[in-house]
Amino acid sequence: MGEISMKSKVCPLIYHFLQENGYVKTAQTFLKETGDKDLAKGKVKKNLLDLLSQKEFLPYLTTEDVGKHKKTKESLEKSNDDSQKISKKGAPPEKAHSSSEASGSGSSSDESDSSSSESESSSEDNDSSSSSSDSESESSSEDSDSSSSSSDSESESSSEGSDSSSSSSSSESESSSEDNDSSSSSSDSESESSSEDSDSSSSSSDSESESSSEGSDSSSSSSSSESESSSEDNDSSSSSSDSESESSSEDSDSSSSSSDSESESSSKDSDSSSNSSDSEDDSSSDSSDSESESSSEDSDSTSSSSDSDSSSSSEDGNSNTDTTTSGEVSAQSSTNSTSSEESTSVKDEDSSKIHDKSLKRKHEDDESSTSTKSSRTTKTPFTRVGDPSQWDFASPALRDNSFNFEDDYGTLANRDLIVTRGKGFRQEKNKKKRGSYRGGRINTEVRSFKF
């Protein structure tokens, strides 16, 4: 190793990492090689694992890097402030609606409608409504007197617990809201939102988000994103669409739904329902157009899957498995696999056609390129060899078999060997051969190399 400058801070860090993980001897040799006696005494605040996972990487960067990092942090904070302002403006104090505007907005109360869109809406508890139009949207609304609407956009809005609203747009945000009647939401952003206590909702769309909501009457939803959402305690719902998401909801009256996503959702305890569509997911729940494994435990739980390869296992009494196509319950405990198979076969045909076309194009390109290559006259030692793209096997037999006693020029090797070898090659059996080649003829008119 030689001399390591102690300014780097990494040296003691490695030393302590080795000692903590039981590599005491290595730590001692490390100390000898670095020649620093204070290594063993000094304590290091940073953990090597944290350093490697880039959590605590800043202290070891150069001043320039730190400057860059500060700039990015400032821009992050600015965007955070903007999003908070927007959310404050969008939420009036009395009976708030959460809607995504600047694209034509529609809001409805006490009903759920969706028009000309890929949408999945799940509404639970009385007097709740969710509507979405002309968009890929998923909206889940729970508890009385709440409404959420999104139009002409990829949006997801969830409103839960009466008199709560959430809206925000185009920001990278981290929002945490605690205590009742609070809301945190972010769209088109990377966000981490955690909401705790009753009547809180957190939603994020088109983002990488981690949202965890705890306490009763809470919902966390994320759309078009990589998200992890976990909601615990009763009356909670977590939904994610167009995303890779993990959502786990525990305790009674909870629902988790995810669409167009890779999601893992697990709901435990009684009165829980969960939906997921167009996704690869491991869900406690239901999945449509996806490969999924779903397990729902405890009584009064439902899991439904449509148009998918899915395996669902429901444990404990009072559980149903439904298959739904476009949100409607078609039959109990049945899976529609035919439609998905048909669609895949159609896709295969299309792809094969495209492949053939591309092959034809490549072939044409080769022909045009070979003519130009062969027409070139360059003074390289291999000018006689010709164009490599024209090289082929000497005979069709060689194409199938790697070696069938035929040499590069199509002659049978075992016959020709006897002729081409010189005198010195064949001698009495017990005498040592003097060399592999002694005389004989060499074919000087070789026009191509074959491999």
UniProtKB/Swiss-Prot annotation:
Keyword field: Nucleus
Composition skew (Polar residues), residue ranges: 320-332
Annotated Acidic residues bias: 135-145, 189-199, 243-253, 278-300
Pfam families xrefs: LisH, SRP40_C
Disulfide bridge map: none
Domain LisH: start-end pairs: 6-38
GO cellular component: a single term: nucleoplasm
Region of interest: Disordered: 59-394
Low complexity biased stretches: 99-120, 146-174, 200-228, 301-319, 333-343, 369-380
GO BP annotations listed: nucleocytoplasmic transport
Location in or out of the cell: Nucleus, Nucleolus
Location, primary (coarse class): nucleus
Residues spanning the membrane: none
Claim: Nucleus is one of the keywords in the record: yes
UniProt feature, compositional bias: Basic and acidic residues: 73-98, 344-365
Database matches in InterPro entries: LisH (IPR006594), Srp40_C (IPR007718)
Protein name: LisH domain-containing protein C1711.05
Species: Schizosaccharomyces pombe (strain 972 / ATCC 24843) (Fission yeast)
Lineage: Eukaryota, Fungi, Dikarya, Ascomycota, Taphrinomycotina
